[in-house]
Amino acid sequence: MNFTPALLALEDGSLFHGISIGAPGQTVGEVVFNTAMTGYQEILTDPSYARQIVTLTYPHIGNTGVNPEDEESAGVHAAGLVIRDLPPLVSSWRSRESLPDYLTRFGVVAIANIDTRRLTRILREKGAQNGCIMAGEIDEQAALAAARGFPGLKGMDLAKEVSTAEIYDWTEGTWQLGSGHAPAPASSPYKVVAYDFGVKRNILRMLVDRGCQVTVVPAQTPAAQVLAMQPDGVFLSNGPGDPEPCDYAISAIREIVDTGIPTYGICLGHQLLGLASGARTVKMKFGHHGANHPVQDLDSKRVMISSQNHGFAVDENTLPGNVKATHRSLFDGTLQGIARTDRPAFSFQGHPEASPGPHDVAPLFDRFIELMKPQGVRK
């Protein structure tokens, strides 16, 4: 079999020659590594990976093909994909398409047959690097120039780019073996407005499972419009990019939280709640991307394994007096959760909805439900 040549170039001058397993052409972005062993389709379709080239450290990727039920959004958001080995055969009764065909259909430039261990060590030691994947006609100097010309994610507002353009209702529950995605429960007593900063579908499904009528709104929706919907709670979704430029979201969240409506944030939503409460955020060296990150609940001291995907973090040293730290990473000590002490608002940096990953932190969704019950804080 004849393979199209491909090249990954990093801004530090590192070059990796391999083969193309996706669309021809060129892509640039911030190169990060993800340590999850499974869930490559969920990772590719997670809007939080916009403008990022994802390196998967597990050596065999593509074994189970792809299928429509495992998508976390309507398309691939990752800027590119880097893997070690693409198996020649797909083995899964759920598979509808091979990974290379899927990548080609969505125009994703991807490379295989490179030393991902060497690449991961570079990213771990030097930090996330801007990079370029070139597939087809290879020009090393042009690839290096493209990598070095990428401005980086610091200061980049991507939430409004990946957000929905229209308000819509979400009624699909989580997937079950043998029955597919569950319909909404007959009784849905809680009206939740979910801000879409790049929301994953499984987050919305877990809200539906818990009896929420979910209305999804664009990232730039003013607080007044959300409050006019008279929600029982407001959810702040995950998303890509730097939270600090999202002034529209920060001001809206501040106004909503001040009304006393229960508010729950995940990932970018966590960072935005922190900023709206007076804290600051920082760019991490290489971020957290994987499904095996230990996090400790600071109240119960319980350790949970979580799914993580973020390159920015709330700076714990900048938390104001009305915000307490609730969770901390056991990998590097970074802040993983906060709660307002004067309002029913809290957030978590990781992904309690997993997809892919463990469900140890899923009870945070139940905490959100408790806040919306009549005996909760607001009522």
Curated annotation (Swiss-Prot):
Start and end residues of each stretch annotated as CPSase: 1-187
Catalytic activity: hydrogencarbonate + L-glutamine + 2 ATP + H2O = carbamoyl phosphate + L-glutamate + 2 ADP + phosphate + 2 H(+)
Any one GO biological process: glutamine metabolic process
GO molecular function: ATP binding; carbamoyl-phosphate synthase (glutamine-hydrolyzing) activity; glutaminase activity
Binding site for L-glutamine: S48, G239, G241, L268, Q271, N309, G311, F312
Alphabetized PROSITE patterns for the sequence: GATASE_TYPE_1
One protein family per Pfam: GATase
Enzyme Commission number(s) of this protein: 6.3.5.5
Pathway annotation: Amino-acid biosynthesis; L-arginine biosynthesis; carbamoyl phosphate from bicarbonate: step 1/1; Pyrimidine metabolism; UMP biosynthesis via de novo pathway; (S)-dihydroorotate from bicarbonate: step 1/3
Active site residues per record: C267, H351, E353
Domain Glutamine amidotransferase type-1: 191-378
Enzyme class: ligase
Keywords of this entry: Amino-acid biosynthesis, Arginine biosynthesis, ATP-binding, Glutamine amidotransferase, Ligase, Nucleotide-binding, Pyrimidine biosynthesis
Highest taxon in the source lineage: Bacteria
Biological role stated in the UniProt entry: Small subunit of the glutamine-dependent carbamoyl phosphate synthetase (CPSase). CPSase catalyzes the formation of carbamoyl phosphate from the ammonia moiety of glutamine, carbonate, and phosphate donated by ATP, constituting the first step of 2 biosynthetic pathways, one leading to arginine and/or urea and the other to pyrimidine nucleotides. The small subunit (glutamine amidotransferase) binds and cleaves glutamine to supply the large subunit with the substrate ammonia.
Family: Belongs to the CarA family.
Protein name: Carbamoyl phosphate synthase small chain
Organism: Thioalkalivibrio sulfidiphilus (strain HL-EbGR7)
Organism lineage: Bacteria, Pseudomonadati, Pseudomonadota, Gammaproteobacteria, Chromatiales
Gene: carA
